[in-house]
């Protein structure tokens, strides 16, 4: 990696990263857990790429629903806020200035902008196509997940909510982990942390959308829901570790947090449009690893740039 991250890495220490991880998860959990419970109790829809159109068209039920939605959305800023705190404690204002410089770095090879559009489709399309071909996603049921007049609002909303996780994940955490680990190991570790950060919402989503047979004894419902949550959390962690490799490839080759922000937005928007049957979740989870393995083979595990840390070509066998 080039010297642009020196202001962050200069004050490197393990406790700072631990502080970052705890602060990111804690801030978000404080926002997400209570709002998820209140939403479930009152039948409120929480904002997400999958509910955006429904919420935009139906509106909020009442003032409490609006407050819950706002607090839930604020929870997405946990990684960003934690990064600001950790960087300031480590290296002060210069580190924060460097982070914001990388957040606004838009002058990169145009091919990276193409990749952030194409890659989400390459990852999501296989499950979508298999769903149609197998009948699990009947053509007769296909509709636009988001009306075209809401596409731009969805893009902007995702850029400035979920996209702004990236100053934390790729702007701070990834460079910190790469001080100790190669790109592959840093990506997998970050992917697991990133997934754990999502767990309160994933648990809520799994429980709120679970469909159990009507003849299931009431005493078994809790156990079945717990099993479904555990399975979903595991699959999410595996999938997120794979997609974290893709983010590392994008970031290490551009040193642009903006590219990561736009890729995050693009992935969420495409996923919202190409929804498929829950029965194909495993395929959706595997596809990031298919892409990750290709990138690791082509660009090398050490930096994912085709070069090793000594600046020479990283040849893979």
Language-model segments: residues:
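Specific transmembrane helices
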Residues: 2-162, 203-211, 232-235, 252, ...
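Functionally critical, cavity-lining and gating residues within the transmembrane helices
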Residues: 153, 169-170, 243
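Alpha-helical transmembrane segments and their helix-entry boundary regions
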Residues: 17-20, 113, 172, 186-187, ...
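Hydrophobic/aromatic residues in alpha-helical transmembrane segments
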Residues: 126, 160, 173, 243-247
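Membrane-interface helix/loop boundary segments of multi-pass membrane proteins
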Residues: 164-196, 202-214, 248, 252-256
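Functionally important transmembrane alpha-helices
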Residues: 188, 214-289
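Histidine-centered divalent metal-coordination motifs
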Residues: 166, 198, 264, 268
